[in-house]
């Protein structure tokens, strides 16, 4: 599999894309002694996981979190070095015009017990949730992934949860997790993600989510990653750059997001790609924090475009400069057709119903439109969770569209593809 000395190749393997999948693929290959070149079109590593610093505020490009319960996260990241900052256990639900806290009774017993008295849930729901938690935590992940596949709505109904907790918690929570308020996501994916929620914490690195790919890239040999190299086409054993250059290698891996992989590979892409689900994340600066805790707030009333909200420097003080204002992150489900000004107006109208007239004084800092936030993960999209990564004898593909649409899926996909190359 290694290239012959003096050959015409530029590397043993060329990887297109420096997101999590491409970086873990590169790390696995270089650890096995392969010479790798990673081509990245943008000015930094990370793909969709990037962080901008604006006036001292750290803005992740979209609302993103790390579940420390992800097995691959524990394998690939130095979690201590990331100085993770965690959200409060549980969530706050905007339900029938009031805020109601739903807490994990095993991590926050007092708040968890109070949750049972909330109109969002019942004692029976609490007991069913504990039983489900026990089921997924005491079943190996491979067995959870192999369970019969139904929609998440059918899974929740089959477990006997009440309509109140379905509408008041599961729907807005899954809208925030999968951009899927209709709960059509595969039950296999939902159970695996809930397993990770139950096993760990929901957190962000102190310096922003981009620290995840940066940490991986720092372990690669010097000059492995080449930024600003946009790939226009992928052939058999060669990569054509948009500037007219060509690089060659015995093996080429396309490690981009799904739509870009489909564009580069066309009908060669095994199984194609599922439609994407999108979101818009807006950042505001407020003089007073509307949520004076590290809470994730979800909307169950659906009276406007906001699905979830968090004050990021309540979670991670390092997301704002010292003595800075409250950094409010607001996200939608889907990418609305209206422009940022119209969307901002709708968001403010929605949140004024939550926090009052002070919302009018918030300053909008940024808006990120992310049409390809996640591949859809409905039952028909996932005949198997591990989709084919081999395109042909010289070309491979990896990314969250090959496994689950998550950080876990991207990391697993990159490693799985590298191991397939090494075994070929």
Model features per residue range: what roles?
Residues 11-38, 422:
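N-terminal Rossmann-like FAD-binding beta1-loop-alpha1 element of flavoenzymes
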Residues 30-54:
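Glycine-rich FAD pyrophosphate-binding loop
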Residues 52-76:
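N-terminal glycine-rich dinucleotide-binding loop that anchors FAD/FMN and/or NAD(P) in oxidoreductases
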Residues 70-74, 78, 83-183, 195-199:
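Mobile amphipathic helical/loop "lid" adjacent to a hydrophobic cofactor/ligand pocket
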Residues 191-241, 247-251:
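Helical element adjacent to the flavin cofactor pocket in flavoenzyme catalytic cores
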